[in-house]
A protein has these predicted regions:
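OB-fold single-stranded nucleic acid-binding module
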Residues: 23-34, 46-50, 54-96
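Short, acidic/hydrophobic/Gly-rich beta-strand patch recurrent on exposed beta strands
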Residues: 37-42, 200
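Acidic/His-rich, divalent-metal-binding segments that scaffold phosphate/diphosphate chemistry
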Residues: 94-213, 234
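OB-fold nucleic-acid-binding modules
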Residues: 1-16
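Acidic, low-complexity intrinsically disordered tails
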Residues: 311-345
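Divalent metal-dependent catalytic cores for phosphoryl transfer on phosphate-bearing substrates
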Residues: 149-150, 159, 170-294
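Divalent metal-coordination and catalytic microenvironments
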Residues: 19, 62, 164, 249, ...
């Protein structure tokens, strides 16, 4: 589609085009007037949007809308002031331009997971992880890893998990005494229960959290899924590796402050925590750099509690590059998928 990418928005420009509604609410200002408050996005990024005409009905979350607007600035952050808005009709837009997608094909990322399962010599872990992948089913191919922060994209959960798996392989060359099967198992299953925690459409847009997600969260649900997978595979729940894997799931946020009721208590659990944090943080910073010109600081990032600087990297263009479209995803170097564990699905 011939329109300006969100990542290249600047103050005072005018915009007319199609965007995807990630959030959409009608709110009431301090003076009692109604207005629309939305997050609109294309595949390169998102922007907060306001429409001060409170008589307009908010579009559904996940809908594609056509807007005529001006880019303004509020509290140091770009904001869209909408003059006109309507829901788009099918055929007016190219969805691949609007949906943030993982930069690699889902099938190739999934093959990295099954390859790791195929390499496992620990039969208990291989059976449990294989069963948990079966339980995740087709939704794993398109689910994001989060609603707004890291890997909030179509196939983001696979992107996050496969990237962590590659980090784990690198770590094992430095610390070969770690239990490879246990570390791989923890990486693969640690966030699978996000599928039960969030409601996502096939475009990878999270519309809400489930009752299960709000009452339990993916850490607690993840533990119950490990136990359920063990039960299905007729593995005693008091088997030590079942308990170790449950501990890795419930401790991978590191501290009670971040949701883990227990800190990591053995080396593979500790390593899982740091691999998870590094991959999430690097993904978030990469997204920030895409939105920030070289030589400039970003707006303050609330999740990091700081601004991020975009250095003048050698050979890099000043303008942030938009993410590749889903159908243009580059092929990712990975272990030979032909040896992947074939019995998972």
């Amino acid at each position: 589609m011939d329109q300006i990418a969100v990542a290249t928005f600047e103050k005072d420009i005018k915009f007319e085009g199609f965007l995807l509604a990630r959030t959409s609410d009608q709110r009431t200002s301090s003076n009692g007037s109604k207005y629309l408050d939305m997050t609109l996005c294309d595949r390169t990024g998102d922007i907060n949007a306001k429409m001060w005409d409170g008589t307009v009905t908010p579009p559904p979350v996940g809908a594609v809308v056509k807007v005529r607007a001006q880019i303004t600035e509020y509290n140091g952050r770009l904001q869209m002031k909408i003059n006109k808005i309507r829901e788009a009709q099918e055929g007016e837009y190219d969805l691949s331009f609007l949906v943030p997608c993982a930069p690699y094909p889902a099938e190739e990322m999934y093959a990295e997971l099954t390859q790791a399962v195929a390499e496992m010599r620990n039969e208990t872990l291989q059976k449990i992880v294989g069963e948990m992948l079966r339980m995740a089913g087709e939704r794993l191919m398109y689910y994001p890893a989060a609603q707004r922060l890291h890997h909030a994209e179509r196939s983001g959960l696979l992107h996050h998990t496969s990237s962590m798996l590659r980090l784990a392989r690198a770590v094992l060359t430095v610390y070969p005494w770690l239990d490879q099967d246990l570390l791989f198992a923890g990486v693969i299953v640690h966030d699978l229960s996000k599928i039960a925690e969030m409601k996502s459409d096939e475009a990878g847009n999270v519309t809400d959290y489930t009752v299960d997600g709000l009452l339990l969260g993916h850490l607690v649900r993840g533990v119950t899924q490990v136990r359920e997978a063990a039960r299905r595979m007729e593995i005693p729940e008091d088997e030590e590796y079942v308990l170790l894997l449950e501990h890795m799931v419930i401790s991978h946020h590191g501290e009670a402050e971040y949701g883990s009721p227990r800190p990591p208590m053995f080396p593979e659990a500790e390593m899982l925590h740091w691999i998870d944090l590094v991959d999430a943080r690097m993904n978030e910073m990469n997204g920030i750099l895409r939105r920030t010109p070289a030589g400039a600081f970003s707006e303050k990032i609330w999740s990091l509690d700081r601004r991020v600087y975009h250095p003048h990297y050698a050979g890099e263009q000043d303008a942030p590059s938009p993410a590749p479209a889903a159908q243009e995803a580059p092929r990712r170097p990975r272990p030979d998928a032909d040896k992947a564990y074939q019995g998972l699905l």
